[in-house]
Design a protein with these regions (language model features):
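N-terminal amphipathic alpha-helix/helix-capping segment at the start of soluble metabolic enzymes
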Residues: 1-21, 26, 114
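Alpha-helix-loop-beta-strand connector modules within alpha/beta enzyme cores
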Residues: 54-75, 107-121
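Glycine-enriched alpha-helix->loop->beta-strand junction motifs that scaffold or abut catalytic
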Residues: 43, 66-69, 86-93, 114-117
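Glycine-rich, proline-tolerant flexible connector loops at the mouths of alpha/beta enzymes
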Residues: 23, 28, 40-66, 94-103
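Hydrophobic faces of well-ordered beta-strands that scaffold small-molecule active sites
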Residues: 16-22, 45-49, 71-75, 93-95, ...
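Short, acidic/polar
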Residues: 26-38, 77-83, 145
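Conserved anion-binding
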Residues: 100-147
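Hydrophobic, well-structured modules enriched for small/aliphatic residues and gly/pro motifs
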Residues: 72-85, 92-109
Length: 147
């Protein structure tokens, strides 16, 4: 069986880890840590946090440092934020290659993930697919996502 280690949590074995996502801005470190600690107490294993801008990436480091459970950085649009999140010590990154930008940008994120030995979740959705591919494949989103 294939497994993926996210911090101290192993995904892919008999136990199914519970993950949730914070709704508050990560720059509110005190609230973030309060919620993370409470979520851990009721059984949450992994927390996902949106990193929408540079300021969030800056505060993410402190949240990761103090969190009792692994942190996943959810990145949209800016590949540099993914790199900053990895450098901040997150335990996993979620990216959507459809909105990160060019193949070169995706490669830079992947290279950084490899360097830090951090797993990635590739999350693709129809909303981020390029219009020219939608037309080329007659809106067959599965074929488009594979390309």
């Amino acid at each position: 069986m294939n497994t993926v280690k996210v911090g101290s949590v192993i995904i892919g074995e008999d136990y199914i880890p519970i993950q949730t996502m914070l709704k508050n801005p990560v720059k509110d470190v005190e609230t973030s840590l309060y919620k993370i600690n409470n979520l851990q107490k009721i059984g949450c294993d992994i927390i996902r946090i949106t990193v929408p801008d540079e300021e969030s990436a800056f505060y993410l480091k402190e949240v990761v440092k103090q969190s009792p459970i692994p942190i996943v950085a959810d990145i949209h649009f800016d590949y540099k934020l993914a790199i900053k999140a990895i450098e901040a010590g997150v335990h996993k990154v979620r990216i959507n290659p459809g909105n990160i930008g060019s193949e070169e940008r995706v490669k830079r994120v992947i290279d950084c993930l490899k360097e830090y030995q951090i797993p990635v979740r590739i999350g693709i959705n129809g909303g981020s697919l390029p219009a020219h591919l939608k037309e080329k494949y007659n809106f067959d989103t599965i074929k488009i996502m594979v390309e």
